[in-house]
Regions:
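Cytosolic-side membrane-insertion boundary helix
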Residues: 251-303
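Membrane-interface capping segments at transmembrane-helix boundaries
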Residues: 26-28, 286-289, 470-478
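Hydrophobic alpha-helical membrane-embedded or membrane-associated segments
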Residues: 10-14, 268, 272-279, 302, ...
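N-terminal membrane topogenic signal
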Residues: 2-10, 475
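Alpha-helical transmembrane segments of multi-pass membrane proteins
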Residues: 19-24, 276, 280-281, 314-318
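Soluble extramembrane regions of membrane proteins in the secretory/endomembrane system
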Residues: 25-258
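Alpha-helical transmembrane segments of integral membrane proteins
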Residues: 305-500
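Hydrophobic membrane-insertion alpha-helices, especially the h-region
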Residues: 7-21
Length: 500
């Protein structure tokens, strides 16, 4: 049962969760949010409580993102007098339409997304006074740039973490490029794009070139201590974007007032921290399956084969295997990679005794962990970060992914929980295995790079959940089942759905 340290952790976790929820609730007050659909595309309209018909800003998310991810910019704009419109691209978030067209051809998926942006923007103009600006992150930076270049009525374009080869010295109008200070390559891209207009001067960050009134304004801005996702929550990013809109639309603010940015980022981290921490004391209530913790308790010299052979053999075996059988980008490959990796691990461990464990306590513990994961991880992510609840076809995809992830985690937890340090090494080996797969087929599996941060985060969070469950139940299999469900869920809801 719970000891003093568990009670202290529980109190601290609950206090953190409560404080975060209060602040996050306040972050969504002061404006009205309305959801609707435009030709099947889910959108959210953020309107100032003051009413009126101000300019409209269409805000577009990046690859494998969703409109929830763009809430910091939307909230910043609406609190400062603009109407913001966010939406889910086809194949993303809660948009049930699959993304069509080639991912590598400009006239394929790129043009389809530009056309979808145009449909949303055409309708969004009617929500305000007719003036329009656009903001796009990562993949969507290229999309909004191309849309603005084909739509002379767009007053300003804000490209966050931009890569947009179609940018010229004069098009699109009034271009702001924002990058995180830790995005080295994208910082250079920002300066290159602005340098097209500043020439013969060398483009410098935080310097505005040209004029808003004739559409020639150009600026590159770098947000401190930010990477590819953190740049969205950085207050400097939001201030730069708001100031750019004010300049483009001629909005005047009181002296000394730079507008009110959205500070939800730290509170989201506090909420997730409290939710993870609370899992430790709650694990004390899980039923005991084995009196003595089970697992592969062997010296390291006998673990290197099951640790390294699957990591090397899996990407080699799958190099030429047909793994494109699901309508979700690289999700089918990941499912097969998990399955083959787990099967090879199990074969390597076949000479070792399978730990005996009671089935009922394991299933009860696994069920409790899965439910807690929905409450502590899925709900906060879906509400405050990005779309994380499956809909339509994605529900079935969770089940398909589970076949692969369950094979991997049952074998891996059996291997890794008995020997100190084995868990870290086994997860490192799996990530390196994915790196080998990408290196062997970069064009086909490039998008796996995007999910590696998510995999690492889930390895840490659910690794802790699994460790606490293992120490309490004595069985590695409760954590294995919970990990398998979590990873199957994350893969099925993260990657875009593809047509054909």
């Amino acid at each position: 049962m719970m000891r003093t340290r568990h009670w202290i952790a529980a109190v601290f976790a609950v206090a953190s969760i409560a404080a975060a929820l209060v602040e996050l609730g306040a972050a969504n007050r002061g404006f009205a949010a309305q959801t609707m659909q435009i030709d099947g595309t889910p959108i959210t309209i953020y309107r100032p409580n003051a009413g009126g018909a101000p300019p409209v800003v269409v805000v577009a998310h990046g690859f494998a993102g969703s409109q929830q991810l763009m809430q910091p910019f939307a909230a910043t704009f609406v609190r400062n007098g603009y109407i913001a419109v966010t939406f889910d691209f086809a194949g993303h978030g809660r948009n049930r339409m699959a993304l069509g067209g080639s991912l590598v051809e400009i006239d394929g998926a790129t043009q389809a997304l530009v056309d979808e942006t145009a449909r949303v923007a055409d309708r969004a103009r009617d929500f305000g006074d007719g003036r329009l600006a656009v903001l796009g992150h990562s993949m969507a930076s290229d999309i909004v740039v191309r849309f603005a270049q084909s739509s002379p009525g767009v007053s300003a374009t804000i490209a966050v973490s931009m890569f947009a080869p179609s940018v010229t010295a004069t098009s699109p109008r009034n271009l702001l490029v924002v990058a995180g200070d830790w995005e080295g390559g994208l910082k250079q891209e920002a300066l290159r794009a602005v340098g097209l207009a500043s020439a013969p001067q060398t483009a410098e960050p935080s310097t505005t070139y040209g004029r808003f009134d004739d559409g020639t304004a150009r600026r590159a801005a770098f947000s401190p201590f930010s990477e590819h996702v953190g740049v969205l929550y950085n207050l400097a990013s939001q201030r730069e974007a708001l100031a750019w809109l004010d300049g483009a639309f001629g909005t005047l603010r009181a002296p000394g007032s730079g507008g009110v940015p959205d500070a939800r980022g730290p509170w989201i981290l506090l909420l997730l921290f409290g939710s993870v921490l609370l899992g430790w004391p709650l694990s004390c209530w899980l039923p005991v399956a084995d009196v003595a913790p089970s697992g592969v308790k062997r010296p390291w010299r006998r673990l290197w084969l099951p640790l390294l052979l699957p990591a090397i053999a899996t990407p080699l075996l799958l190099r030429l295997a047909p793994t494109h059988f699901l309508p979700i980008l690289v999700g089918d490959y990941l499912a097969v990679h998990f399955f083959v990796y787990g099967a090879l691990t199990a074969l390597c461990l076949a000479s070792l005794p399978l730990p005996w464990t009671k089935t009922r306590p394991v299933l009860l513990s696994a069920g409790a962990m899965v439910v807690y994961g929905f409450v502590a991880i899925v709900w906060p992510l879906d509400t405050f970060v990005t779309s994380f609840v499956p809909s339509g076809l994605r529900v079935a995809l969770v089940g398909v992914m589970l076949v692969g992830t369950l094979a991997y985690f049952v074998a891996d937890e059996w291997l890794a929980r008995g020997t100190p340090g084995a868990y870290f090494v086994s997860k490192l080996a799996f990530v390196l295995s994915l790196a080998i797969a990408v290196a062997l087929d970069f064009e086909r599996l490039f998008f796996l790079i995007i999910i590696v941060p998510v995999i690492l985060l889930f390895f840490i969070v659910y690794g802790l959940f699994g460790l606490w469950a293992y120490r309490r139940t004595g069985s590695p299999f409760a954590g294995a089942i919970a990990n398998a469900v979590a990873f199957a869920w994350a893969i099925a809801v993260t990657f875009p759905l593809l047509a054909g």
